[in-house]
């Protein structure tokens, strides 16, 4: 079972994915759950946020193993960690795509970088290929950012379009898609 969990900021999407992992761990003693965390600590605020998430996750879901990844690691780690006894949570695709779109070295440049769309597309294709090859359940978290106003900048508009396209492609291979609204799950595709 592959599930895509979408929602806005603070909509409850990560909590929903963590609850899926907790239920998985409780269902069978041999089960394991792994969270592939895509956030990277690029500044003090993000470091504090990541540390807070680590602490809160450890309290909410004892036994959930967290692996912090770089932008290149998601497809390969997804395949490496996936098995019939292991549920893998990817949190989140939005940050993963952000890091592909604006690599670390480009974020510190004075000029606005232009991402290599070919490189980004190749990595997205690798993720989709990995999702089709997984050997166990996967829950992917992503932001739904296309419901707001149209952004002013050309690069931001292109990113919103790219994330929307990524979400559509991931949803197409998932058996379940859940939209989180104010902490409430709305099943968009699949069974409740």
Each PLM stretch: what is its role?
Residues 36, 66-69, 89-92, 140-141:
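Short, conserved beta-strand edge motifs with alternating hydrophobic and charged residues
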Residues 17, 53, 89, 143, ...:
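Residue-level signal for inorganic ion chemistry
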Residues 31-34, 86, 137, 176:
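Residues at the starts of beta-strands that form the adenosine-phosphate
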Residues 63, 84-87, 134-139:
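Loop/turn-to-beta-strand initiation segments
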Residues 2-6, 94, 190:
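Flexible, compositionally biased loop and terminal segments
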Residues 71, 80-101:
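A basic- and aromatic-enriched beta-loop-alpha substructure that forms the phosphate/nucleotide-
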